[in-house]
Amino acid sequence: RTYTLKPGAQPTVAQTSAELGRDIRGDNYGRLEGYWMTEIGALNQVVHLWSYESFEERARLRGELSQNGRWTGEYLPRLLPNLMRQEVRIMNAFVPVKAPATEGNIYELRCYRAKPTKVKPWAQAFANIMPVREKYSACSGAWICESGQPNEVCHLWAYPDLNTRVETRAKVMQDPQWQEF
């Protein structure tokens, strides 16, 4: 889920989510895998990643959350005035979600749109080349989008800082196996 916020609202939304949203939700309505604020690319956004055992479980838990009085009476009234729009992607992982070995990272979420019928072959090729790519940095997860943006693949990378990201990407681009991919 991606929220696009009014300019300047990120700190308020982050604090509200940390202090109130997490207290209400915990992992009782889906497991929170990550929560990020954008600083490069589309600005004024908060991206959060939730995992569920199935689409049916997601629907059931979202229904239960919508009946939670604290969610609807306390959290949403503080969030909604800051929200301009939201985007929801339903994604299936083909590289399992895994937390990075260290904290305090910057994250890069890359999304690509494939031609119709080409997303699954691309994802398989990407999964196959992952051992080569992970010689340089570990992938935090990769997904095929089922809804929101069909024919889209997203993957997430953690780096200690932007300089390390630039250096890592430069090394990856020099790898002959990666170049073949």
PLM regions with names:
Residues 1-180:
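Short S/T/G/P-rich N-terminal loop/turn motif that feeds into the first structured element of a domain
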